Amino acid sequence: MAASVKDRAVLDAIFNPLLPLGDCPQEIIEEELPIENTNEDDVKRAKEYEIQGVEKAEAGDFVGALDCFNKAIDVAPLRASGYNNRAQLSRLRGDNQSAMEDLNKAIELSHEHGAAAAQAYTQRGLLHRLEGNDEAASEDFQHGATLGNAFAKAMTVQLNPYAAMCNKMLAEAIGKLSGHA
């Protein structure tokens, strides 16, 4: 059962409360590389566990959600999405170290391709930013932006000092032209 665009928007808002609504580009959502040594039934079961995990997280049952994400990873350990979802849950629970480990694994397994990679790079960029490591955050946001994540694109601009200076100058110029300066 594929989630609708509205369902994906709601799930994205739940798992990424700091991200702007609707930032997940449609063209990368469905992309998933075939996974070697994993049969389609296992992938289907893993996706079902992930959906159950998201539903439990939405209901505030983080322990139940974690159990579902762990089952998804057990069933399809080479699938990046399970690690990415568990990382998002870990971040919500305040366990940034576990989140970082899962995001690193998601990036490795995704081969830097598709929605899982875009989300993992963006989430890892947020964790780096929380740690005060803006250089690493900028690199991850650039990767996420390249893969189509709109929030990562915005953060790439925000962390670029030249872009920030240009944005400030542009805002001042527009303010002067409109008489608000």
Curated annotation (Swiss-Prot):
Cited Gene3D superfamilies: Tetratricopeptide repeat domain
TPR repeat ranges, renumbered to this chain: 46-79, 81-113, 118-151
Alphabetical GO biological process terms: tyrosine metabolic process
Keyword Ribosomal protein: no
UniProt KW Repeat keyword: yes
Top-level taxon in the UniProt lineage: Eukaryota
InterPro entries linked: TPR-like_helical_dom_sf, TPR_rpt, TTC36
Keywords: Repeat, TPR repeat
Pfam family membership, one: TPR_8
The protein's name: Tetratricopeptide repeat protein 36 homolog
Organism lineage: Eukaryota, Metazoa, Cnidaria, Anthozoa, Hexacorallia
